Amino acid sequence: MASGQQERSQLDRKAREGETVVPGGTGGKSLEAQQNLAEGRSRGGQTRREQMGQEGYSEMGRKGGLSSNDESGGERAAREGIDIDESKFKTKS
């Protein structure tokens, strides 16, 4: 049990130095803060998927995956002739 506590304090030290030690915890200034951020981000994505439905959520991901620093996903989709059905982005009623 002591090794678990030691590992936690090591991770907390790294987090306080600015290192991301929890996937999805970017920006947290401590181990606990990073864990809370990661949990909130995960929950936010799940809620959005429930609101839009799996199909709309996937379609939005397709569009976002096409974006770059130079152009938005919508601009690239139009330029390359990729069909993105934005009607699927609407939340379910």
Curated annotation (Swiss-Prot):
Protein origin, superkingdom: Eukaryota
Keywords, ordered alphabetically: Stress response
InterPro entries linked: LEA_5, Sm_Hydphi_plant_seed_CS, Small_hydrophilic_seed_prot
Annotated spans, Disordered: 1-93
Expressed in which tissues: Embryos and young seedlings.
GO cellular component term, pick one: cytosol
Compositional bias of kind Basic and acidic residues: 9-19, 73-93
Any Pfam family hit: LEA_5
Presence of keyword Iron-sulfur: no
GO process annotations (BP): response to abscisic acid
Record's note on what induces expression: By abscisic acid (ABA), osmotic stress and salt.
Purpose of the protein: Lea proteins are late embryonic proteins abundant in higher plant seed embryos. It may have a role in desiccation tolerance by acting as an osmoprotective protein or as a desiccation-damage repair protein.
Protein family: Belongs to the small hydrophilic plant seed protein family.
Name listed for the protein in its UniProt record: Late embryogenesis abundant protein B19.1A
Provenance organism: Hordeum vulgare (Barley)
